[in-house]
């Protein structure tokens, strides 16, 4: 059915970079040259979900990329722990898979994610008092979009002020295809990062190797 609807996969393809020569690859040779890593065992998914207990490993049934693949397994951490891991990865020039609730307080023209972008409370004459935990529990917020977390702006004390992600909506959207998020927005609407294990503390890695991760649902 996939071949009928999408076409037969190519056996080779040509890959070229700006100011570089084109080179022909098979999918396997491309993987070996540009990745060369064990994508299954070399990474760990980290979640910030304050509605569930921190420092526990969770597994979601039937949330996988292929029928015979593994369920999503993640370690739930406080936001500050995730920030430390993300900063360590970025300082080592290693970008990360990142997911968030991208539609909240997004100014797409400026490419800015900031809870202070819009003053809904003054406009509506009310207050919105739910915190992140309550928004998750009432399904008012959740992970809706994945991007590449690639940069962070730190103050003199080494604390993050804002973050940059590379998006997939084209170069005319946001700042040349990128979005900037304030650290305040990161706290409220960031949900997942996938980091290489070498940036993750041993105490966090030890939580992955339990025999029966907790089912959150």
Can you annotate each of these PLM segments?
Residues 1-62:
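Aromatic-residue-lined binding/catalytic grooves and analogous aromatic/hydrophobic interfacial grooves
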Residues 66-147:
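Long, positively charged binding patches that form subdomain-scale interaction surfaces
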Residues 208-217:
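Single conserved hydrophobic/aromatic residue that forms the stacking wall/gate
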Residues 17-25, 70-77, 173-181:
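Short, exposed beta-strand "edge-strand" segments with a Pro/Gly-rich flavor and a Y/T-containing core
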Residues 128-206:
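C-terminal soluble interaction/assembly domains
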Residues 12-19, 110, 152, 202-203:
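Cell-envelope/ECM-targeting effectors and their regulatory/trafficking segments
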């Amino acid at each position: 059915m996939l071949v009928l609807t999408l076409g037969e996969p190519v056996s080779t393809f040509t890959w070229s970079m700006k100011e570089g020569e084109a080179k022909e690859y098979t999918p396997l040779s491309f993987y070996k040259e540009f990745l060369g890593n064990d994508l299954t065992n070399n990474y760990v998914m980290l979640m910030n979900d304050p509605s569930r207990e921190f420092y526990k490993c969770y597994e979601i049934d039937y949330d996988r990329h292929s029928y015979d693949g593994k369920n999503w397994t993640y370690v739930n951490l406080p936001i500050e722990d995730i920030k430390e891991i993300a900063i360590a990865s970025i300082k080592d020039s290693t970008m990360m898979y990142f997911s968030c609730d991208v539609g909240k307080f997004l100014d797409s023209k400026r490419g800015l994610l900031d809870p202070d972008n819009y003053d809904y409370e003054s406009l509506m004459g009310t207050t919105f008092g739910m915190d992140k935990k309550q928004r998750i529990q009432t399904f008012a917020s959740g992970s809706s979009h994945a991007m590449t977390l690639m940069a962070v702006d730190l103050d003199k004390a080494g604390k993050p002020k804002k973050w940059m992600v590379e998006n997939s909506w084209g170069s005319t959207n946001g700042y040349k295809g990128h979005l900037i998020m304030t650290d305040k927005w990161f706290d409220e609407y960031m949900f997942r990062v996938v980091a290489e294990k070498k940036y993750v503390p041993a105490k966090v890695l030890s939580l992955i190797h339990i025999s029966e991760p907790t089912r959150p649902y």
